[in-house]
């Protein structure tokens, strides 16, 4: 980075050369006129919308958690274009170039009807409605109620060649000289982590780690009470020097405060009064004997609502074309992979399934003999338009790529070749027998996946590419908008008129 910094005086001096500069992929990647279409199978998932259903011993997950308020992080793998047997070998010289994919367009298809799902908690920490209070209510030791609500409406997707980065607030470590922190609010710090498949997004209670910041397990709904709600870190990804984590994003969020409640429990930060020399600055105390003499809780909070769900505001089931990315990477898929992070709770209907606990079936309604179950289903289909590109193998370009990610050059088999060793080595015939020494313990080195520690929904596209773009819906849309589709005109056939050279004599009538 070239930054102008102040010197010891009052004059700002320019940076001293040489200064490293990150080039855009448009400066060294050569694009061709060859396009491929790739589409996935229909991707389905079924589970419980609030939590994992485990076995009796708790060791095995029998029904996974599948919520409409979860991120779907797809890791899409494409074939290596350098292994393609191209019909026209004049496209590139393998001694001078390497082939890469560039994303030109995509469409995220979503099945299932639009619907609003609710979430809640059977022991939700709320005292009462504070919007329209009729009397001053005193609290007890436990005022939790069974409450449900609909979450904030979210539609969002982020694409890149590295995983999407998320942010959330968590408990920060206290200083050594802080003393006893029992009963005090912990310090907070902003943390970053990769958004994995199944992570929860914000539904109206903020992007925080509820596992460490919700001691009573009643401040939020069941689906996030034991989870960390993440929000995409758009600021960090937009300032990424290489621009790999976010080519572009589409976002639509909406909510409004539907109900206004107050928390139960003692107030941690009391309203300033005379004990801190702030008497009568915030309120005038009530008379003795009145209920208002003892102040109620002032920890107010709303439960939000996502409001109307309509097909007019859908971001899915429509194509998006990438002409210019927000960062230096203009859609080049390094490593032949793409990460698609999706958040959508506009299809948030939860199925209610009832079964009888009696073998013969019930003749009359009895709630004790009926068992209710909850299930949530999701349906996706991913389609892409890929452009074949060439990367020249010159020193300047290879230096840039090596500084960005040395694993790319290893995949291209352009690694450093050591000088051959001319020394004589010993080779035993029966190395595994007891008559010879133990074989050298050389572990087999396997290439480490840089994203293997994260959980993604893996989508294999290695056998899904096609040059026949006009045979697919997204391909036809791409050909039309790019002006590459040839118009098929049909000549209008007219009936032939036969002309006779002989003149017809008219008969004279009398």
Swiss-Prot record:
Cellular location(s): Virion; Host nucleus
Provide one Gene Ontology cellular component. Answer: T=7 icosahedral viral capsid
One annotated GO biological process: virion attachment to host cell
Instruction: Name residues in a coiled coil.
Output: none
What keywords is this UniProt entry annotated with?
A: Capsid protein, Disulfide bond, Host nucleus, Host-virus interaction, Late protein, T=7 icosahedral capsid protein, Viral attachment to host cell, Viral penetration into host cytoplasm, Virion, Virus endocytosis by host, Virus entry into host cell
Q: Polar residues composition bias: which ranges? A: 132-147
Q: Which Pfam families match?
A: Late_protein_L1 (PF00500)
Any GO MF annotation of the entry:
structural molecule activity
Region named Disordered:
128-147
User: What biological function has been recorded for the protein in this entry?
Assistant: Forms an icosahedral capsid with a T=7 symmetry and a 50 nm diameter. The capsid is composed of 72 pentamers linked to each other by disulfide bonds and associated with L2 proteins. Binds to heparan sulfate proteoglycans on cell surface of basal layer keratinocytes to provide initial virion attachment. This binding mediates a conformational change in the virus capsid that facilitates efficient infection. The virion enters the host cell via endocytosis. During virus trafficking, L1 protein dissociates from the viral DNA and the genomic DNA is released to the host nucleus.
Q: How does it assemble?
A: Self-assembles into homopentamers. The capsid has an icosahedral symmetry and consists of 72 capsomers, with each capsomer being a pentamer of L1. Interacts with the minor capsid protein L2; this interaction is necessary for viral genome encapsidation. Interacts with protein E2; this interaction enhances E2-dependent replication and transcription activation.
Q: Which family is this protein grouped under?
A: Belongs to the papillomaviridae L1 protein family.
Task: Check the record and name the HAMAP family matching this protein.
Answer: PPV_L1
Question: What name goes with this protein?
Answer: Major capsid protein L1
Species name for this entry? Human papillomavirus 38
Q: What is the lineage of its organism?
A: Viruses, Monodnaviria, Shotokuvirae, Cossaviricota, Papovaviricetes
